[in-house]
């Protein structure tokens, strides 16, 4: 058995294989386990696919049974993984939520925009949001005839300056802030935060239930054109409330209204049991959405993507990695990621291709036949040639910065700077980032550090 400090790539590829083997879209329960991804040419339908882009919030890499969770059972996400490709080396664009969403919506490093600098956006500010003239995934797809919707967490700028419906989404239902109480819908700063487009609405049911209902209703419409649905759950972000925890919500909301600060960060509450309930409810909700695709005959016309917006928080499981949300160790940025397109993309595959949020933006644009705006070049690189064209991908530099931390991955090597100290790790042998090779391989360290600095020079400086 591998020791913790030398948990191998082979072990990662095997993680969760048995879990997904038990279920599958239109496959028998005893179907074969997943196999390593093999680049092959795949015939894609001429019709532009629908795009269902689902985000969990603060979900740890090993919080799904498809990724080896021993306690949390996620049969619907396991089934989704079994129907397509499960990625072991996929990353978020940041280790916190709003910068990752900037990366997803623009296909560019979060640091190219002022709104990507707060890490994350904590309060309304006219400087912090996606500029109204900046192209987005939604606006570029609208040019290709797509209808577009975003349900759930936005977190890319507050009213009165910013809104999804001003930058490409036809409709929006959700919250503008980084986190809200699941029942009362109050945000951590004491403001009520549930909107339809730009109009405040009242619905005191469990938030995950509401967002799921909206998604199902959208899918069940009589669509004449292809569509993009960004489905941004807040689960399992704080506060720690499951569907039956209205009493917890009442207590937290009362304290919030009394003026107590930091209430919704919920540092005096939560448990592993509550967290398990939240993740399993998220899984059941995604199952409802996928069943709506099946029921309406749209499943084979729809690319379904699932990931977390960053690494796990307090009660999450990021094994075998170290670190968590807000940090650039693997546990803060490596996220569970699934891509499914039944009938087009062969299923039961597991890939160790390194990819980051902005790469998925480029991928979705290419699948939709959209062209990035020349004045706003993408930083992401499409995976379409690899996934559907049978062409191996050139090694990419994956870049992060976060509150004085630095990270860059090239192949299996990772440059990491924490507290002003440079580190170098070989992730093919040391995913826990324990064996620092900085002194043994100074030339590699210098090369990756220089690559990081070249990218950083093109970004906005922190204020």
Where are these regions (language model features)?
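Active-site-proximal cap/lid insertion segments
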Residues: 35-49, 56-72, 79, 88, ...
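Glycine-rich, acidic and aromatic/proline-enriched surface loops and short helix-turn segments
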Residues: 101, 106-111, 233-237, 310
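C-terminal region of N-terminal signal peptides and the immediate post-cleavage residues
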Residues: 23-35
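Catalytic-site neighborhoods of secreted/periplasmic enzymes
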Residues: 103-202, 396, 405, 417
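Short, surface-exposed beta-strand/loop micro-motifs that present aromatic residues
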Residues: 218, 404-416
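Residue-level detector of anion-binding/catalytic polar loops
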Residues: 86, 147, 414
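N-terminal secretory signal peptides and thylakoid transit peptides that target proteins
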Residues: 1-20
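Short Gly/Pro-enriched turn/cap motifs at secondary-structure boundaries
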Residues: 93, 130, 325-330, 398-399, ...
């Amino acid at each position: 058995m591998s020791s913790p400090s030398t948990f191998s790539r082979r072990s990662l590829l095997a993680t969760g294989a048995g879990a997904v083997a038990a279920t599958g879209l239109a496959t028998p329960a005893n179907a074969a386990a997943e196999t390593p991804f093999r680049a092959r040419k795949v015939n894609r339908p001429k019709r532009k696919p629908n795009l269902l882009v689902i985000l969990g919030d603060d979900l740890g890499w090993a919080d799904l049974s498809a990724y080896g969770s021993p306690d949390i059972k996620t049969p619907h996400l396991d089934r989704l993984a079994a129907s397509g490709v499960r990625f072991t080396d996929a990353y978020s664009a940041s280790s916190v939520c709003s910068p990752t969403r900037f990366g997803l919506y623009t296909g560019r490093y979060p640091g190219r925009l002022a709104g990507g600098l707060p890490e994350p956006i904590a309060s309304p500010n006219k400087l912090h949001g996606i500029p109204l003239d900046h192209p987005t995934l939604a606006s570029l797809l609208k040019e290709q005839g797509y209808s577009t919707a975003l349900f759930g967490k936005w977190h890319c700028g507050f009213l009165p300056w910013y809104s999804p419906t001003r930058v490409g989404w036809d409709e929006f239902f959700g919250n503008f802030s980084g986190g809200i109480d699941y029942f009362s819908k109050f945000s951590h700063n004491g403001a009520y935060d549930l909107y339809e487009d730009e109009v405040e609405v009242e619905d005191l049911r469990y938030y995950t239930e509401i967002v799921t209902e909206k998604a199902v209703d959208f899918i069940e419409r009589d669509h004449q054109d292809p569509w993009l649905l960004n489905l941004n759950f807040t689960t399992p972000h704080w506060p720690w409330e499951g569907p039956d925890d209205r009493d917890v919500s009442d207590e937290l909301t009362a304290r919030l209204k009394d003026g107590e600060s930091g209430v919704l960060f919920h540092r005096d509450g939560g448990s592993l049991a509550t967290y398990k309930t939240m993740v399993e409810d998220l899984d059941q909700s995604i199952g409802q959405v996928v069943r709506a695709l099946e029921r309406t005959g749209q499943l084979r016309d729809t690319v379904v993507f699932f990931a977390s917006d960053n690494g796990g928080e307090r009660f999450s499981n990021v094994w075998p990695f170290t670190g968590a949300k807000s940090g650039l160790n693997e546990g803060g940025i490596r996220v569970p990621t699934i891509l499914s397109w039944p009938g087009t993309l062969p299923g039961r595959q597991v890939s160790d291709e390194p990819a980051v949020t902005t790469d998925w933006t480029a991928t979705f644009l290419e699948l939709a036949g959209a062209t990035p705006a020349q004045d706003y070049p993408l930083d992401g690189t499409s995976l379409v040639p690899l996934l559907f064209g049978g062409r191996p991908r050139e090694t990419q530099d994956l870049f992060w910065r976060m509150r004085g931390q630095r990270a860059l991955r090239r192949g299996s090597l990772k440059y990491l700077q924490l507290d002003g100290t440079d580190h170098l790790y070989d992730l093919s042998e040391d995913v826990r980032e324990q064996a620092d090779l900085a002194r043994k391989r100074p030339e590699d360290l210098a090369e990756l550090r220089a690559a990081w600095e070249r990218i950083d020079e093109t970004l906005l400086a922190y204020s």
